Every structure is written in structure tokens, then in C-alpha cells.
């Protein structure tokens, strides 16, 4: 029986300003995968945000790391099995050939709003 990779994506709400609030909704909230699987995590914005979407990975007890910028650009040093797609309101983080070391929380965030 193969080992499983447990991934947790979570909803992160961020208010961009008082004139235009953007809500980001991720799905699924939790998933299990077997090493070698392909995994997709969806992030939907409540309004058009062009390509202003970043993805982050956070392992338990560690700081979040930046993995995808502006929806599709892989951050240097991140393995190429990670990729991002989307524009406007619908975005996807894809992990191809997932590995056990990829077990983590994943979250999307409109890039103009990272503290």
C-alpha cells in the first residue's frame, strides 16, 4: 500500500480596500494523494483581479513560502512539478507527480495584499 500525501488548502479572506472587497474561495479544503498523482487546487475570486494571484505553501511549524507569482510564474527554486494557471476570477495550482515532501497547507492570495 502506497503512502499518502495529505494536502490542506484553506479559505483566506482578504479585504483589498473599502471600495472593492475581494473574497477568495479555495477548494477542495482537504485532499489526500498518492505519490506520483496530479493534484489541482482551485481558487476563485469574487471579482476580476487580472493575474494578481499568488500561491503559497506552508508546512506545519514553518513559515509560508512563495511558490507561484502573478498566477503563472514559478518562483525561482521551486520544483517545476508546481505550476499555476488562470486569469480574472478562476485560478488553479497544479502539482504534477506529487511527492511526500509536498504535504502542506496551500493558499492563494491576491498579490497586492500580502502583508
Swiss-Prot record:
The keyword DNA-binding does not apply. Residues 44-54 are annotated as: Complementarity-determining-1. Residues 70-76 are annotated as: Complementarity-determining-2. The keyword Cell cycle does not apply. Residues 77-108 are annotated as: Framework-3. InterPro entries: Ig-like_dom (IPR007110), Ig-like_dom_sf (IPR036179), Ig-like_fold (IPR013783), Ig_V-set (IPR013106), IgV_Light_Chain (IPR050150). GO terms for molecular function: antigen binding. V region of the variable domain of immunoglobulin light chains that participates in the antigen recognition. Immunoglobulins, also known as antibodies, are membrane-bound or secreted glycoproteins produced by B lymphocytes. In the recognition phase of humoral immunity, the membrane-bound immunoglobulins serve as receptors which, upon binding of a specific antigen, trigger the clonal expansion and differentiation of B lymphocytes into immunoglobulins-secreting plasma cells. This is Immunoglobulin kappa variable 5-2. It comes from Homo sapiens.
Amino acid at each position: 500500500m502506497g503512502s499518502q500525501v495529505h494536502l490542506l488548502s484553506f479559505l483566506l479572506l482578504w479585504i483589498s480596500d473599502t471600495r472593492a472587497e475581494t473574497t477568495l474561495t479555495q477548494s477542495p479544503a482537504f485532499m489526500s494523494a498518492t505519490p506520483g498523482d496530479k493534484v489541482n487546487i482551485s481558487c476563485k475570486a469574487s471579482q476580476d483581479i487580472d493575474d494578481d494571484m499568488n500561491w503559497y505553501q506552508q508546512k506545519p511549524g514553518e513559515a509560508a513560502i512563495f511558490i507561484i507569482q502573478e498566477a503563472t510564474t514559478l518562483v525561482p527554486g521551486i520544483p517545476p512539478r508546481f505550476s499555476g494557471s488562470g486569469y480574472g476570477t478562476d485560478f488553479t495550482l497544479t502539482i504534477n507527480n506529487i511527492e511526500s515532501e509536498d504535504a502542506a497547507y496551500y493558499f492563494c492570495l491576491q498579490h497586492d495584499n500580502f502583508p
